[in-house]
C-alpha cells in the first residue's frame, strides 16, 4: 500500500519541478483519479493551474452540477459545454478503438483551446497504473494514453498518480481531505458513457445509459460493488402495454475488484435484479429488456468497449 503523506509530498515536488514557473491545464472529470491529480497539482502550483471540466454529453447524471459545487474553491476552474461537438465527432463511428481515439482527440482539442487562452505549456492527467498496463498490453487504449494525437501542442504531460492502483488513489484522496463523494466514488471511464454504448454513440443512447446507470448505482449501493453500471447493447423486441415495441437492450454489470486488473461479477438477489429491471423499463419507454452480465474479468473486460 502507498505511504500517503510521503507520496503526496513527492508528487507535489514532482509537479512543481515539471511545471516550474509555467502554466498548466488539467483534465478534471470528477472521478477520484482526476480529482486527486487536480488537487495535488492545485496545491503544488496554485493559480498556475487551470482545471478544465469538459461536459461531453457522456457524463454521469448530475455530474456537471456536482463538479461546479465540489471544486468551487478552485477559482480558475473552467466548465466547457462541448456536448454537440463530441456527438458530431462520434457520428457514424462504431469501432470501439476508433471511438476512444476520437474522444481522446476531442478532449485534447478542448484542452488546447483553454491552454492557448491561459498560456499553458503543460497538461496534467489522472492516468493510473492499470490504464498504462492495458494500453501497453494492447488490451484497450485509454483516452488519456492511447487516444492522444501524434502531435500535441504542450511541452509536456504530467501524470502524478501514474504508478498507483485505484485503491491507493482512494487512500491519497482521503489523506488530501477530499469529500467522500469523490474518494469513495465508483470508477467511471475516461471516455464516459461512450464505452457503455455498443455501436454508434447518439444522444438518445447516452440518455438511456445515463438514466439506467443512475438506477443501478442507487439500487446496488448496499452491495458495495467496486463498479456497477448499465450499458446499451442494441435493440430487441418487447411489449409495452398492448403494443409490440423494438427497444433498447440494457445490460447491468456489477463487479467486485481490488484494482480493476481482475474482477468478479457479483451475485445479486433475484428481487434486486427484478427491481432494477422494473425501474429501468418503467422509467424509459424505449427500453425493451434488461439483462445481467455474469462474466468475470478475464475473460471479459469490466467495460463493454
Curated annotation (Swiss-Prot):
It holds the Pfam family NAD_synthase. Catalyzes the synthesis of GMP from XMP. Heterodimer composed of a glutamine amidotransferase subunit (A) and a GMP-binding subunit (B). ATP binds at residues 29-35. It catalyses: XMP + L-glutamine + ATP + H2O = GMP + L-glutamate + AMP + diphosphate + 2 H(+). It comes from the Archaea. Pathway: Purine metabolism; GMP biosynthesis; GMP from XMP (L-Gln route): step 1/1. Residues 2-185 form the GMPS ATP-PPase domain. GO terms for molecular function: ATP binding; GMP synthase activity. This is GMP synthase [glutamine-hydrolyzing] subunit B. Gene3D superfamilies: 3.30.300.10, HUPs. Its EC number is 6.3.5.2. Keywords: ATP-binding, GMP biosynthesis, Ligase, Nucleotide-binding, Purine biosynthesis. One of its GO terms (cellular component) is cytosol.
Amino acid at each position: 500500500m502507498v505511504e500517503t503523506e510521503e507520496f503526496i509530498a513527492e508528487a507535489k515536488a514532482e509537479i512543481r519541478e515539471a511545471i516550474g514557473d509555467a502554466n498548466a491545464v488539467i483534465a478534471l472529470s470528477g472521478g477520484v483519479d482526476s480529482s486527486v491529480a487536480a488537487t495535488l497539482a492545485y496545491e503544488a502550483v496554485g493559480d498556475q493551474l487551470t482545471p478544465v471540466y469538459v461536459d461531453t454529453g457522456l457524463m454521469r447524471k448530475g455530474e456537471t452540477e456536482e463538479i461546479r459545487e465540489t471544486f468551487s474553491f478552485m477559482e480558475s476552474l473552467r466548465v466547457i459545454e462541448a456536448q454537440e461537438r463530441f456527438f458530431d465527432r462520434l457520428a457514424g463511428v462504431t469501432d470501439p478503438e476508433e471511438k476512444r481515439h476520437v474522444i481522446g482527440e476531442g478532449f485534447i482539442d478542448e484542452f488546447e483551446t483553454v491552454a492557448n487562452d491561459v498560456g499553458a505549456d503543460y497538461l496534467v492527467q489522472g492516468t493510473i497504473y492499470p490504464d498504462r498496463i492495458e494500453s501497453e498490453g494492447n488490451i484497450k487504449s485509454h483516452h488519456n494514453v492511447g487516444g492522444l494525437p501524434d502531435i500535441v501542442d504542450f511541452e509536456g504531460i504530467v501524470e502524478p498518480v501514474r504508478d498507483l492502483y485505484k485503491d491507493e488513489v482512494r487512500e491519497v484522496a482521503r489523506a488530501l481531505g477530499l469529500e467522500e463523494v469523490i474518494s469513495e466514488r465508483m470508477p467511471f471511464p475516461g471516455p464516459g458513457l461512450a464505452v457503455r454504448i455498443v455501436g454508434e454513440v447518439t444522444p438518445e443512447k447516452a440518455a438511456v445509459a445515463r438514466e439506467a446507470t443512475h438506477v443501478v448505482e442507487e439500487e446496488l449501493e448496499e452491495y458495495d460493488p467496486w463498479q456497477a453500471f448499465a450499458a446499451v447493447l442494441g435493440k430487441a423486441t418487447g411489449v409495452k402495454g398492448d403494443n409490440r415495441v423494438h427497444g433498447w437492450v440494457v445490460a447491468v454489470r456489477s463487479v467486485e475488484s481490488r484494482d480493476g486488473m481482475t474482477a468478479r461479477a457479483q451475485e445479486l438477489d433475484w428481487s434486486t435484479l427484478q427491481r432494477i429491471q422494473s425501474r429501468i423499463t418503467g422509467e424509459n419507454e424505449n427500453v425493451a429488456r434488461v439483462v445481467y452480465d455474469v462474466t468475470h474479468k478475464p475473460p471479459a473486460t469490466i467495460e463493454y468497449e
